[in-house]
Design a protein with these regions (language model features):
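Alpha/beta-hydrolase active-site loop
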Residues: 116-139, 160
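Active-site glycine-rich loops that stabilize anionic/oxyanionic intermediates
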Residues: 61, 68-73, 274-275
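Cap/lid segment of the alpha/beta-hydrolase catalytic domain
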Residues: 98-123
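A fold-wide structural signal in alpha/beta-hydrolase
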Residues: 91-96, 191
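Short beta-strand/loop motif that positions the catalytic acidic residue
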Residues: 194-196, 200
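Structural cue for short, hydrophobic secondary-structure segments
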Residues: 66-69, 96, 270
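A domain-start/cap signature at the N-terminus of enzymes
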Residues: 19-63, 75-81, 86, 120-125, ...
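Bacterial N-terminal signal peptides
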Residues: 4-15
Length: 311
């Protein structure tokens, strides 16, 4: 009898208890700039989102991840790249994540760091995966058209994402950044657009000849490009063309290795005399070298990205 009464009381209490509300869904994002935060490995991670002016939440929208260079962060990448303007014009969502480090000067765990620079590095591949999951709760993302571009260390991170997150990244466009990981084993062919200045003094074009910075172990530009030509099964004989005009201050060549598996390709754009810069944008400081004014990295990237989506 006592057991029956106890059971009855528990049942009555459960019935009278207020129902638990389901977890609140995040509010969808509208056009404009937004900041999102995530917890990863005990660290608070942030990323900025720019939703373009013409965004329609009923229509799946492409996403471009813009990864900053070393000693930078997401907000710095906004003005460094100028991709927000391109986002509004072309209609894609642009995301500016921040790496990890001390204060505002952050880096990506793209591989390649040696000595103390290699200690305690975050799992940034997992972070980008979680970021995309979170973004999908507030923006109508076209999962077949998620792209990554990046400057310097951010460009190196693009190569790592192509190798280790190829099931979610449709194509990559590293600028002034080469392969920093030992081995690349993508699950699928990933189209690559690599942009580099021939006079880059920070990530030199010919690093394969022993010119890497003392705290990093990197591949050279040609070695990075050829790695992905082979991984994608592209034609060994490329098509080369001049995309600058006669009389331009800097000559810009585009070399395309086409015919890759699943429609993939590898494209190398070289700015003759260009430094460690983002073509089409003024360099913030003089010592990083000259930037091309006659071509736009943002235009080249978007033209390239539009040709490729996950299949």
């Amino acid at each position: 009898m006592r057991t029956s009464l106890t059971t009855l009381l528990i049942g009555l209490l459960a019935a009278s208890a207020p129902a638990q509300d389901p977890p609140k869904q995040p509010d969808p994002l509208g056009p404009g700039d937004h900041t999102r935060t995530l917890m990863m490995g005990g660290l608070k991670r942030t990323y900025l989102v720019h939703v373009p002016k013409g965004y329609d939440p009923k229509t799946p929208t492409p996403v471009v991840l813009a990864l900053h260079g070393a000693a930078m962060n997401g907000p710095m990448m906004v003005w460094f790249s100028g991709l927000t303007t391109k986002s509004d014009a072309a209609g894609f969502v642009v995301v500016y994540p921040s790496g990890t480090g001390t204060g505002p000067f952050l880096t990506w765990n793209a591989g390649g760091f040696t000595g103390k620079m290699a200690e305690g590095k975050a799992d940034d591949v997992a972070f980008i995966g979680k970021l995309l999951d979170d973004l999908g709760t507030v923006v109508t993302v076209d999962g077949k058209r998620v792209y990554a571009c990046g400057m310097s260390n951010g460009g190196m991170m693009c190569y790592r994402l192509a190798a280790e997150l190829s099931d979610r990244i449709a194509a990559v466009a590293p600028v002034a950044g080469t392969i920093a990981i030992e081995e690349s084993k993508p699950k699928r062919p990933v189209p690559v657009l690599h942009i580099h200045g021939s006079k880059d003094g920070i990530v030199p074009f010919e690093m394969a000849k022993g010119k890497s910075p003392p705290f990093m172990k990197l591949k050279g530009v040609e070695e990075s490009v050829q790695t992905w030509v082979k991984l994608n099964g592209c034609d060994e004989k490329p098509k080369a063309e001049m995309i600058s005009k006669d009389g331009d201050e800097m000559k810009v060549t585009r070399t395309t290795y086409g015919g890759g598996k699943a429609g993939s390709e590898v494209v190398l754009v070289v700015v003759e005399g260009g430094g460690h810069t983002w073509p089409g944008r003024e360099p913030p400081v003089g010592f990083i070298g000259k930037s091309a004014r006659n071509v736009s990295a943002n235009d080249l990237m978007w033209e390239f990205f539009q040709k490729h989506k996950l299949k």
